[in-house]
Design a protein with these regions (language model features):
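Flexible, acidic/Gly-rich N-terminal and inter-domain linker regions that tether
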Residues: 1-90
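Conserved Radical SAM active-site core
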Residues: 59, 69-98, 108-175
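Short pre-active-site segment immediately N-terminal to redox-active cysteine/selenocysteine motifs
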Residues: 102-106
Length: 175
């Protein structure tokens, strides 16, 4: 269950019988991007192995503070393609809807770790603005649900969004 996910670096290290020397850097780096590891994923990791490949996907490390030349916090160049909150429109005939910033697991290599999810919540007025934008742009044929993980959206809310999008005649595909 998502609610029982490990979010504390100390708890992760203890559960995996890993040395406390990893704790300071894990706590510091988790301030940059939070730790989130579902128990089902954690249970597949090898106890006592700091080089476990699954652990390396989720363990915050000090290297996350390195500023590498040529790297950017917006690797997909989405900041200039957000015409209204929650909508990313980079390609002529398709747009992304950012349904949620939440994921079941926070991978350290996440390309959207710096995405301003709090400014892109698709609720209330933002949802109405997103719908208006999608209706106005008749070149759009496809809407792609994205996030975080769009499937953490409640069934009721997701169904309502799909129904609203199905009412836009020029949209042919939802994925």
């Amino acid at each position: 269950s998502l609610k029982s996910a490990i979010t504390d670096p100390k708890a992760l290290l203890e559960r995996l019988s890993l040395p406390n020397e990893l704790l300071e850097q894990a706590q510091a780096a988790s301030q940059l991007f939070p730790l989130r590891v579902p128990l089902e994923f954690l249970n597949r990791m090898e106890l006592g192995n700091p080089d476990d490949p699954l652990l390396k996907q989720v363990l915050p490390i000090r290297d996350e503070f390195i500023q590498a030349p040529g790297f950017t916090e917006d690797p997909l160049n989405e900041s200039d393609a957000r015409p209204t909150p929650g909508v990313v429109h980079k390609y002529k005939d398709r747009a992304l809807l950012i349904l949620s910033g939440a994921c079941a697991i926070n991978c350290r290599y996440c390309f959207r770790r710096h995405f301003p999810y709090s400014d892109n919540q698709l609720s209330g007025e933002h949802w109405q603005r997103a719908l208006a934008y999608l209706k106005e742009h008749t070149e759009l044929r496809e809407v792609i649900f994205s996030g975080g993980d769009p499937l953490v959206t409640s069934d009721h809310r997701f169904s309502k969004m799909v129904a609203d999008l199905e009412a836009i005649p020029h949209l042919e595909r939802l994925r």
